[in-house]
């Protein structure tokens, strides 16, 4: 894959080999691949998934003291995924009757690395029972490896469903999220069915795991049908402004494109704003995640489609994982939540039904 740096954005030449894309998540177990390799995980994963969907059942053991939980999230963005996630987590913990103390820090994705490092070290210093974090960058990975090998704090990794192969034998307590690859495949299927057979462009997140899982997977799937040549791809700063600026460049350099595939909410909304200003709303653009801001943009016709996460399920899953752990039950290594494809043509009734399901705790 040829890459060329253009400040402040990264433009990637549209020369992607299918081999390169197949290796986009090298070093990780793809979710289906993981279940095939470790079939004993499938029944426990299915039981856990049903527990997440079910109404809460109270903790069955007595607690000597509250559990201490530290949460470090990249929550300062337009996407409300992280804020809703922690709200659903707390409400499910309360419903389960678990006594807990929570320390949480929201940072900006791709920016506040120093703040993240300080918060993470404080979590270990305070001897948290559970640390909830994410894995996107090399810095994240190095810290996680430090925790895995030198701390008794149990680690729950959020927003990732592909276990790291190198950690086999010393894995985190659990990976919880929505399978980025599967979401990308759903959007690829939508574009293959509905987009004009023209070149397209990709707006990545910042460099890291999410861009690989969402972006490279999508490109690989589109390459397979041969009707949609990739015109250009940009890494962004994971912000609305960087998505806006990249889209202006895309349309200037490749005015013939039929759609823009965006890898995240903030980036998608920036792209939609640029297309509106350029009067190029003939170019399709998607959201990614289906949070409140995206659903509003879909209703206005500013976005064409999104994959909507059943958002609160991952917050519920974190609470249920802690409950199972306190009760001495075996916890599955991975929980992967459900998606629904939503388009601007969908009825208000369907959107309302999906919102009631996705935000069942966080909208209370």
From Swiss-Prot:
It is found in: Periplasm. The keyword Signal applies. Keywords: Periplasm, Signal. It comes from the Bacteria. GO terms for cellular component: periplasmic space. It holds the Pfam family Peripla_BP_4. Residues 1-22 form the signal peptide. InterPro entries: Peripla_BP_I, SBP_2_dom. GO terms for biological process: regulation of DNA-templated transcription. The keyword Signal applies. GO terms for molecular function: DNA-binding transcription factor activity; transcription cis-regulatory region binding. Belongs to the bacterial solute-binding protein 2 family. Binds to the signaling molecule autoinducer 2 (AI-2), a furanosyl borate diester, (3a-methyl-5,6-dihydrofuro-[2,3d][1,3,2]dioxaborole-2,2,6,6a-tetraol). This complex then interacts with the LuxQ sensor protein. This is Autoinducer 2-binding periplasmic protein LuxP. It comes from Vibrio cholerae serotype O1 (strain ATCC 39315 / El Tor Inaba N16961).
